[in-house]
């Protein structure tokens, strides 16, 4: 995993001052961490498949041809063209984890991982950030037809039961998990995007819990 070891002081500095528009060539460290996690998951699922056969019954994200691009390169491409902040990738990771837990017949594999990533990152971007690209743009970045990505988004939302809410404590716990994943390697860290956490907290205050899922649906479908 190509990450740069940083001190706590540098981490705090990056956390509060990291600018994607001013420094467009700097890839967030969370991308390396997330790609490493997914690569390990792919390897584990491949071993399970060889031992027990099959990759599960949920095949909604399967593609006919496996993209000739590593997970790291694919995530870097998404960042390069969307400038999605670190918090988007953390929330996408939350969604992927929830999806796998809620759909026991699904396993991440080479045939579905790229489509799963572009779909969850797009949805997470809509949930986290104020300004977003259209689905057609995300489709172009991800190498899909717009209609295909629209269908994947709807399938994902229904399979998730529209449970997209990520509160501050959940967000922080996943950040800590990602940090623990790389701490063994010598003090690696990821950006947690404090602004995102504060925005999520403010939304919790203004949103009516009784209408929460309807509100999320309106955000996603815009």
UniProtKB/Swiss-Prot annotation:
The keyword Cell division belongs to this UniProt entry's keyword annotation: yes
Keywords assigned: Cell cycle, Cell division, Cyclin
GO aspect biological process, one term: cell division
InterPro entries per UniProt: Cyclin-like_sf, Cyclin_P/U, Cyclin_PHO80-like
Tissue expression: Expressed in roots, stems and flowers. Expressed in the shoot apex, leaf primordia and young leaves.
GO molecular-function terms, A-Z: protein kinase binding
One Pfam family of this chain: Cyclin
Family: Belongs to the cyclin family. Cyclin U/P subfamily.
Record text on subunit structure and interactions: Interacts with CDKA-1.
PANTHER family: CYCLIN-U2-1, PTHR15615
Name this protein carries in UniProt: Cyclin-U2-1
Species: Arabidopsis thaliana
